[in-house]
């Protein structure tokens, strides 16, 4: 028996103001929760009205957490089977009793969900049926709460494992339909709470797979009619009197939202034939259901347009998304095509226009306005975002319709130009700009677009009456990625953009001006000479802006400037680096110290900005390779590693890798701060880093190639990590280990862990890329041929290795050179091992083939570096393989300094002079064509 009074006392103490008392009480409760009966006692408190509400609420939270954590009986503190049965029965009773308590009810439903999700075979259907069939609203409501949780818990059940949830739906949905029919027209809050639960239950019932219940078409029609009725149902006066922001929180508005949402989701999910969805079903949806939905949606659009029906942003988003899907599906497009221009003019375009609410937001909260209308990471499920997608889709899928849209927006531009004092025309001007910017990719007449920029955008940037139009015009520039041909228009645009960036005090104008500057600079290299003198000033302003407002656009602009104006920024590099480091550490420290356990939108924004800052630092290091930045930037990497900031590991390691390469270039050695960071990283593998090995692999490759040849202090600790990862059974980690070991063999002329790597590579269940072990074997043969062959023999791997090698096709310069050098190494051996001698024919022919293929590989490597197309008739699969391999060509290795053509020439010349018999034997392995090819190569090398 638990100590009830002691537990109750502890619960009360968790609500006092003294942190020390709270902590002690929580520690005691943690010990109490291990005792049988603890969970039942918490439920006693929750269900007893005699206890104070705050005590009951706190107990409910502990109850929920305990059940979520300990429902598994196998746990040491797991709840026992007999207690579970009692808890389940009493949870339902407590929920029914407290369904009007807005504080306790949500916690109880979460608790029930925790049991359902925990793979518990808890059949709630009989209980739900009794509650729903009672005819009493006080029972129907908790019944629907339970149905909602049941559908939610089984939403991912796949075909073949849906028998239970299908039987529940078959039994309960007819009752639910009757309830919905009875209260569908009601406008009171409770009735709409019930309708809300009905719609959400439908959503989760159909989320992943179609319930068997809906195999009968008339049942689908019944639910569609219910949804359509709720979509067009006007809101009561009391809801319309609420502020729009508060209005969207009302359950009656949410019912409308999910009316549209479920219909949209249904079409998005069920528009293709699958194993479970028949052609007959799809035909019924397309030929019967969708036409009915569209007919009603068109009525809703008309009512919304004449203000007789108010729709929330979410409802509009789902409505537009449904229409968008109809545009993409060829069988449905004829249903919507005759109405497309009306849809554009009456729904899509108005959603893209400014309005009184958006302007009020700009005046009241510039930061939130910028986030809402210009932060691509925040747009999400809004009607203007859906409308922008709709416009882009028309350009992509139905380009013939642009002939109707473009004259419309041109007319808006012209009318605003003639009547710019009309605020309603200014609102429409924003819609025209947003429409235009989403069609840039589909307009093949640059001169037409440049004229629009000259005639309409330039004047908008010059006025200060409508600052929302200045911001939108700047965004329009930022979204145009083509090079300008008219230097006069380009000069005007840049000058006005630059002026707005420096002088405006309107935040969205400053942010979008920065983005526009980036786009103009990236797309128009011809203006770089004129711009270069202004770059330090722009960078200073960007740094100031980024301190007061967190958005990744600013980091992207800084990165673009650093990449293209490294010489101009070099004198300011250390100051710039210090500023970037200061900003990053400020954000990172705030994230580390954040007491909240939840991940908020603000956290995401901070992480995005911090990642952008790290990327800018990396670009600085790579672009300003003559500037020593190691001392300035190393603290950033150290902070990320020591504080285990997983969100930034990849970017921090990229920065460290760039710093390591920079150190090698500047000093021809690894600077002490890099070694210190390597020490910290190796230490972190004792705690958290082993799970993120892949992120570190690029740095390990670089340190192996550039650092270990000079200093072997950390060789053994790294090899221990690599050995552990070979045992991890994580395929991509193992492949990275083999890559690192390959570079280790080349740079250190040693072959550690090869035997272990062979054993792992033969595990077919891992599905490793066979090229990994082939390249590692080749590198080891290059480093220590005799020892490598001996290990292969001992592991019974020789035949396997050579078979895989001869069957693989490599495309990179690195891989071809490595193979040539390995073959030469084997052919040079005074006594060819028995395991290799039968392969001399294959090796000699492969040597000539590889040498012949090398010039093309070099040209392709240079083409990739210069951004040009690859040479030769490569299949798409071969091109993909090449681009995977070409990473090897971008790294500096010991092979870079070896001229393999010269090596081949020297080998055959020396062999001919020193061992004519062996020379003849090798030459005779070649047919006449290959002999001629070899002779051409040898003559070419001797002449050059």
Curated annotation (Swiss-Prot):
It is found in: Cytoplasm; Nucleus, Nuclear pore complex. It comes from the Eukaryota. One of its GO terms (cellular component) is nucleus. GO terms for molecular function: nuclear import signal receptor activity; small GTPase binding. Residues 25-97 form the Importin N-terminal domain. PROSITE patterns: IMPORTIN_B_NT. PANTHER family: IMPORTIN BETA SMX1, IMPORTIN-7, 8, 11. Associates with the nucleopore complex. Interacts with LHP1, PAB1, RPL11, RPL16, RPL25, RPL31A in order to import them into the nucleus. Also interacts with the nucleopore complex proteins (nucleoporins) NSP1, NUP1, NUP116 and NUP159. This is Importin beta SMX1. It comes from Saccharomyces cerevisiae (strain ATCC 204508 / S288c).
